[in-house]
Swiss-Prot record:
Listed pathway(s): Purine metabolism; AMP biosynthesis via salvage pathway; AMP from ADP: step 1/1
Reaction it catalyzes: AMP + ATP = 2 ADP
Residues covered by region (LID): 126-163
Domain notes: Consists of three domains, a large central CORE domain and two small peripheral domains, NMPbind and LID, which undergo movements during catalysis. The LID domain closes over the site of phosphoryl transfer upon ATP binding. Assembling and dissambling the active center during each catalytic cycle provides an effective means to prevent ATP hydrolysis. Some bacteria have evolved a zinc-coordinating structure that stabilizes the LID domain.
Protein name: Adenylate kinase
Matching CDD domains: ADK (cd01428)
Organism: Phytoplasma australiense
GO molecular function term, any single one: adenylate kinase activity
Keywords assigned by UniProt, alphabetized: ATP-binding, Cytoplasm, Kinase, Metal-binding, Nucleotide biosynthesis, Nucleotide-binding, Transferase, Zinc
Pfam families: ADK, ADK_lid
Record's GO cellular component terms: cytoplasm
InterPro entries from the UniProt entry: Adenyl_kin_sub, Adenylat/UMP-CMP_kin, Adenylat_kinase_CS, Adenylate_kinase_lid-dom, P-loop_NTPase
Summary of the function given for this chain in its UniProt record: Catalyzes the reversible transfer of the terminal phosphate group between ATP and AMP. Plays an important role in cellular energy homeostasis and in adenine nucleotide metabolism.
Length: 217
C-alpha cells in the first residue's frame, strides 16, 4: 500500500502519519527527514539544497525530486510506504507518477486534511515540540504529562519558529499558491479522499481506515 498525505501546515499530518504507519505497517517517508539525512551525510544534493535554504529560497523541484527518488529507490522492494511532505506541487506529482510507473508501484490513495484558516491559527498557537527528539505536543489537545517537558526524553518543549504567527501565515500562503492546485490534480484523477483535519486524532484515523478498507474490498 502507498499513501500520500496532503494538508496545510499545522493540520497534524505528522501525527496522523505516525499513527497510520504504525497501524498499517507502512514505512513513514517524511521529506524533512530525507533532507536532514542528505545534510548530515553531506551528499551533493544536500550541499546543493543548502545553498538555496541558506538564502531563504525554496529548493528547486529538480533537486527535491532527485533526492526523493534516490531515497524511494532504496525502499521500493518493500513497496509499502506513506509519503508526508511530498509532492508539494503538480510538477512534483507528475514526476512521482512517472517514478511509480517505472518502478511498477501503485498509489492507493491521497488523503487531504482540510481546515479553515482561523482554526489552523488556533491549533498552531498551542503546538510545541521536543527540542531533542522532535515529538509533537499540543497544549490543549495533546499535552505532556509534565508541563513544558517531553514525556519521551524529559527534554524541554519549544515553539518552532515555523509555528510563530507571522512565519506560519507565510507558510500558509505558499501552501495555498502551490499545493491547492495539487489537491485539484488528484481530485481529477479520483485518487483524493478529503477529511476534516480539525477533528480529534482518533476520529480522523478511523475515517481514513474506513475509506481504505472500502477501497480494498
Amino acid at each position: 500500500m502507498i499513501l500520500i498525505l496532503l494538508g496545510p501546515p499545522g493540520i497534524g499530518k505528522g501525527t496522523q502519519a505516525a499513527v497510520l504507519s504504525d497501524l498499517l505497517k507502512l514505512q513513514h517517508v517524511a521529506t524533512g527527514d530525507i533532507f536532514r539525512k542528505n545534510f548530515q551525510e553531506n551528499t551533493p544534493l544536500g550541499k546543493e539544497s543548502k545553498k538555496f535554504i541558506n538564502k531563504g529560497l525554496l529548493v528547486p523541484d529538480e533537486i527535491t525530486n532527485q533526492m526523493i527518488a534516490d531515497y524511494l529507490s532504496q525502499i521500493v522492494p518493500h513497496s509499502n510506504f506513506l509519503l508526508d511532505g511530498f509532492p508539494r506541487n503538480v510538477f512534483q506529482a507528475q514526476f512521482l507518477e512517472t517514478f511509480f510507473t517505472k518502478s511498477n508501484l501503485h498509489l492507493n490513495k491521497v488523503i487531504y486534511f482540510n481546515a479553515f484558516k482561523q482554526d489552523l491559527m488556533k491549533r498552531i498557537e498551542g503546538r510545541r515540540i521536543c527540542s531533542h527528539c522532535g515529538k509533537v505536543y499540543h497544549l490543549d489537545n495533546l499535552p505532556p504529562k509534565i508541563e513544558g517537558i517531553c514525556d519521551k526524553d524529559q527534554k524541554k518543549l519549544i515553539q518552532r519558529e515555523d509555528d510563530k504567527p507571522n512565519t506560519f501565515l507565510k507558510r500558509l500562503k505558499v501552501f495555498n499558491q502551490e499545493t491547492l492546485h495539487l489537491v485539484e490534480y488528484y481530485r481529477s484523477k479520483k485518487q483524493l479522499f478529503e477529511v476534516d483535519g480539525m477533528q480529534n486524532i482518533q476520529q480522523v484515523t478511523q475515517k481514513i481506515l474506513k475509506v481504505l478498507e472500502t477501497e480494498q474490498k
